[in-house]
């Protein structure tokens, strides 16, 4: 097999992304058509959304480089049987156009808030994966009344929540490394302007390489019940994960005090990408927690 990427410091992070892209094509995708879809003008850009089903609103926030279909295609058919599912594609992702607007978690969370305003959704349960989980944390901190229950899948509220090799993975990467990749094919399939590909990747790599920290004190102030789902080998620093759970009121002894309202689930033998592919497991956790 021809070696496309050279250098040990480059190969591992590229493989991480390649696996992430691969899941897009492994997914059967949702078989449903959205009951509603469109663009919301918010904070100077137009954010794409899709709505499925009826019931209590449930907002889904995808991971970096992902789309609604690629991230949530296996879950939406089941979730939308009992919930009004609102899936959003963030700046530059999927159907949402690229913008040279500064990309940061606070702005992305504000975009989600704007979409909820547009759809007249006062509050909702929110589920975020990876980058989407960080956005969900930010939304909960800045607009706590928006979030009834929060589900965080393989994500963190600070850079040091990742193991060092993950936190530094994107710093040496360049847009040209993604040429002719499955990610490029997925982008070309739905992006409003395919010529923005290189700018999008460059923007995302800069965003992912930027350190962030929403503050332990802000996490401790979250009053919404939180479910954290992590793969045991998903790249999250498990010491920091335990601290996060303690900040949310967990990690004690429920034999001696009431069970905390926030929960932690560590799925065995799963990576960052792999845990998201465990649709049945995730649906089971969501069903129990979101009731």
Where do the protein language model's features map onto the residues?
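Active-site loop/oxyanion-hole signature of alpha/beta-hydrolase fold enzymes
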Residues: 87-127, 276
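Active-site nucleophile elbow and catalytic-triad environment of alpha/beta-hydrolase enzymes
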Residues: 203-218
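Catalytic active-site module of serine/aspartate enzymes centered on a nucleophile-bearing elbow/loop
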Residues: 260-291
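Alpha/beta-hydrolase fold catalytic core
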Residues: 2-58, 82, 291
């Amino acid at each position: 097999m021809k070696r496309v990427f050279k250098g040990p410091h480059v190969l591992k992070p590229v493989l991480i992304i390649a696996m992430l892209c691969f899941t897009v094509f492994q997914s059967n995708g949702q078989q449903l058509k959205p009951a509603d879809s469109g663009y919301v003008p918010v904070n100077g850009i137009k954010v794409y959304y899709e709505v499925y089903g009826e019931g209590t609103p449930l907002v889904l926030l995808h991971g970096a480089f992902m789309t609604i279909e690629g991230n949530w295609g296996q879950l939406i058919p089941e979730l939308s049987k009992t919930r009004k599912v609102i899936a959003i594609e963030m700046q530059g992702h999927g159907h949402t156009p690229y913008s040279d607007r500064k990309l940061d978690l606070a702005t992305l969370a504000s975009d989600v808030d704007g979409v909820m305003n547009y759809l007249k959704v006062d509050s909702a349960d929110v589920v975020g994966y990876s980058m989407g989980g960080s956005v969900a944390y930010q939304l909960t901190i800045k607009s706590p009344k928006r979030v009834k229950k929060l589900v965080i899948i393989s994500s963190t509220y600070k850079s040091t929540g990742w193991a060092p090799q993950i936190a530094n993975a994107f710093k040496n990467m360049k847009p040209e490394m993604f040429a002719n990749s499955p990610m490029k094919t997925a982008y070309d399939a739905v992006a409003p302007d395919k010529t923005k590909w290189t700018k999008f990747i460059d923007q995302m790599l800069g965003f992912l390489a930027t350190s962030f920290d929403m503050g332990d004190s802000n996490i401790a102030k979250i009053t919404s019940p939180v479910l954290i789902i992590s793969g045991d080998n998903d790249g999250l620093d498990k010491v920091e994960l335990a601290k996060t759970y303690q900040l949310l009121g967990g990690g004690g002894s429920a034999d001696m005090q009431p069970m905390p309202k926030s929960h932690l689930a560590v799925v065995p033998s799963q990576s960052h990408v792999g845990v998201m592919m465990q649709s049945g497991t995730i649906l089971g956790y969501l069903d129990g927690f979101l009731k």
